[in-house]
Amino acid sequence: MLDKNAKIYVAGHRGLVGSAIWKNLQDKGYTNLIGKTHKELDLLDAVSVRKFFDEEQPEYVFLAAAFVGGIMANSIYRADFIYKNLQIQQNVIGESFRHNVKKLLFLGSTCIYPRDAEQPMKEEVLLTSPLEYTNEPYAIAKIAGLKMCESFNLQYGTNYIAVMPTNLYGPNDNFDLERSHVLPAMIRKIHLAHCLKQGDWDAICKDLNQRPVEGIDGNSSKEDILAILAKYGISDSEVKLWGTGTPLREFLWSEEMADASVFVMEHVDFKDTYKQGDKDIRNCHINIGTGKEISIRELAELIVSTVGYQGQLTFDSTKPDGTMRKLTDPSKLHALGWQHKVEIKEGVQRMYNWYLGR
């Protein structure tokens, strides 16, 4: 167990997972938390990161900061996804080592697994065949991060644990229509289409003022607003989504991801992540997921039902689906003592309630 007064740095504490980890730590009575916004500390800047570690001397680190996005963003910003994530990891993990951090938790992604991996995916399938092309740069960066943790542990005896969460959603998610992941993107699209159907321009303007789309906000003309929404497949009568709707995905409520992360930080050490006596020590990362899946079409229909939208859902099969099935095997985590509780229907309702309350 960690001392409640231990100095804990949460990198990315304003993001989807980082904010949930921060809240979970506070709820558990931890009193000495450190968080820096991107404006206060640019994790891409090695000099600034070293200065931060020199000054703060954290004892424990949650590395939840990353450059992330959905299929569209991964397709467009390939260089950014590999370069920025490698740089963040290099800086934070490197300075954690140089400053003798007692324990580090690195958050990766299940996109590290091969495109055609056997389902559900066990940790052992890593690097056994090619990755999904659309998110290959991001996946390679995350694989490098987990291998950094593993390699530092093996060479220097550090205690860096890598966890691979499935698709996450929850409070403080990213709802940018170009860069967000599938679930928050669908919630926003269907919500805006519902507002159009209801003629609720106050709600539309409020939404766009909070999250402008390509420079269009609530002060723009109705014509400009309708045009930009149409570009993203949003109208009063229809919501168009990428792909066929047939891929299967697994989703985990972000606050549960945070609980699992804190559980691992408190109770799991590197020696617990592999079989003692193994000649080759690898695949020491831990999947964090539900082990349950839903199709993209079924998810969209669940969101339509939750929002109350009366229009049509259509799928653009000329756009990529990404991996057709991506389900984690969380049995390693279960054996260590943690399991999820929030199912997808309850989670989507919570998510939409949070979105409306912003």
Show the residue positions of the predicted features:
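C-terminal substrate-binding subdomain of Rossmann-fold SDR/epimerase-dehydratase oxidoreductases
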Residues: G12-L16, A20-K28, L192-R358
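Adenosine-cofactor binding site in Rossmann-like domains, unifying the SAM/SAH pocket
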Residues: Q26-K51
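SDR active-site strand-loop-helix element
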Residues: A11, K36, V61-F67, L104-T110, ...
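NAD(P)H-binding glycine-rich loop region in Rossmannoid oxidoreductase-like domains
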Residues: A46-L86, E95-R98
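Conserved Rossmann-fold NAD(P)-dependent oxidoreductase catalytic core, especially the SDR/UDP-sugar
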Residues: K4, Q90-N135, I161, N174
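Active-site Tyr-X1-5-Lys
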Residues: Y133-T166, V182-G199
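Short-chain dehydrogenase/reductase
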Residues: I82, L86, T134-L146, D176-P184, ...
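Active-site segment of SDR-like NAD(P)-dependent oxidoreductases
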Residues: V68-G69, T110-E118, T166-Y169
